[in-house]
């Protein structure tokens, strides 16, 4: 037997043994660790950007308004790129190729940051790398659900490794930036992006199947206009808009309140630990409660979280409580949202459904980053986070009145 074949068989047997050891036997032949490894590195990149990108731009001397604009640019690209790549993925069926090319072009595009640190050049780098970065995840989500087939509720058991990658990154970089200058920040991002490229080469392909699923008739537009679907997508944008001040300025806000970068990294990690625990519980939650109830609870807790962060973040116990609420504002929201998208579109429209989710999340995130950038210095953190709270409450009202009560 050739050595390369024997090595592959060895790792396959190890993968199966580990999956069985942790009670995941029903997911075989799911390539659990290969999918999980990709999520780990993909969200490690988010863990490197969400807490520290604004801090890096502040280190370069940009104003709050400019920081808000630079952070919003990747989110604006999220409004454009996923729809193009989603249509291409559904049309060609070559989703894994799109994932691999997107990961490689993300790395190459971001590497241009080493040429200049001017505002115009950084804006170009943010737009270029984000155009390809946002091509990756929606297509990979379709591949993951294709591997899961009739067990979509187990998505969270794979996705939780993305949260692990986020946690490791924020802790490591938080400590690192206490000892070293933020000038090394772009190098750290390039290393993580290289990991995404390598993991994309390790993942096997899979295509969505309609077998065992209730037939969903009509094209993408007809499915999109089904009862409750437009309302759901509106709430996606509102939820991400409510996160705008958090993702853009919470690190700077906590620094101004006297927290060290190491502690800030741990606080970010705490939120994602809560998210991981929620992912582990989501299968049981979605089997017991309707998507409508889970989404409503997520939005209401998000509204409360932003009020706490905007008004009482100087109290550590309040800050700890607010970070634990990340379990709802991202964990339960994202898992239930993915379940909603997966059940609402047929196999031939899954890529477009995921792309629209990413697009509207980008619209909301960009709007949130922009208004936070312009209001932070003029209105202050309390008013800025209060506006975020209102957006989350609006999403709760829409879900309560427009989404039907049924089980995931």
Regions found by a protein language model. Give the residues of each.
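Hydrophobic core of transmembrane alpha-helices in multi-pass small-molecule transporters
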Residues: 40, 109, 119-136, 237, ...
